[in-house]
């Protein structure tokens, strides 16, 4: 049986790409408390512009090239439906707003879990160039609350500061983790460099 489809936003009312975004079926290690209710578990539909997606995201640029099946279908039919699985729809909608220059819709503050989720999606969809000053605004309220002792939250800070290119913060939390961790650093399924985690290649 197909999952229920919920209508999301038209980030471009005349867009030629329909993005069918489905949330993760299981909690991720980096946000174990994030559970999707039956109401939230359905697919969310977003309308977007292939031009904006391709310019903003290396992931979509590759996926929409005419050499690929999706790109060929777009060229042939003038529109396409793309599945975007295992993706938090709310965070993805924020990135779509940034990609489509809808900055009035972008929040200036987010929860820490939302900050981590946004970093995960920015890293995956490779859309760093559309962020502007938003990461600094999102991070600033949480800096003073970060832990002084190594824990799982330290690992999240390593990832967030790395993705959002906060070099001073990255150096601080990375040194803390390397200095205080007694074994390999548990990455919580985040793509953190092996040079930091201590794992051999």
Protein language model annotation of sequence segments:
Residues 56-57, 130-137, 170-175:
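Short hydrophobic alpha-helical segments that form membrane-spanning helices or hydrophobic packing faces
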Residues 12-14, 50-53, 57, 88-92, ...:
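Generic preference for well-ordered alpha-helical elements
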């Amino acid at each position: 049986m197909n999952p229920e489809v919920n209508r999301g936003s038209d980030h471009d009312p005349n867009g030629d790409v329909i993005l069918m975004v489905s949330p993760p079926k299981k909690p991720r290690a980096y946000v174990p408390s994030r559970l999707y209710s039956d109401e939230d578990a359905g697919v969310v539909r977003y309308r977007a512009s292939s031009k904006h997606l391709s310019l903003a995201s290396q992931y979509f640029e590759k996926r929409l090239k005419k050499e690929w099946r999706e790109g060929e279908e777009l060229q042939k039919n003038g529109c396409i439906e793309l599945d975007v699985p295992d993706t938090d729809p709310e965070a993805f909608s924020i990135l779509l707003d940034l990609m489509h220059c809808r900055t009035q819709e972008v929040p200036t503050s987010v929860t820490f879990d939302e900050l981590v989720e946004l970093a995960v999606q920015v890293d995956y969809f490779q859309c760093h160039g559309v962020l502007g000053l938003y990461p600094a605004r999102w991070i600033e309220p949480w800096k003073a609350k970060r832990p002084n002792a190594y824990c799982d939250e330290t690992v999240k800070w390593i990832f967030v500061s790395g993705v959002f290119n906060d070099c001073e913060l990255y150096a601080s939390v990375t040194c803390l983790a390397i200095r205080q961790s007694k074994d390999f650093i548990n990455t919580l399924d985040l793509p953190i460099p092996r040079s930091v985690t201590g794992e051999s290649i």
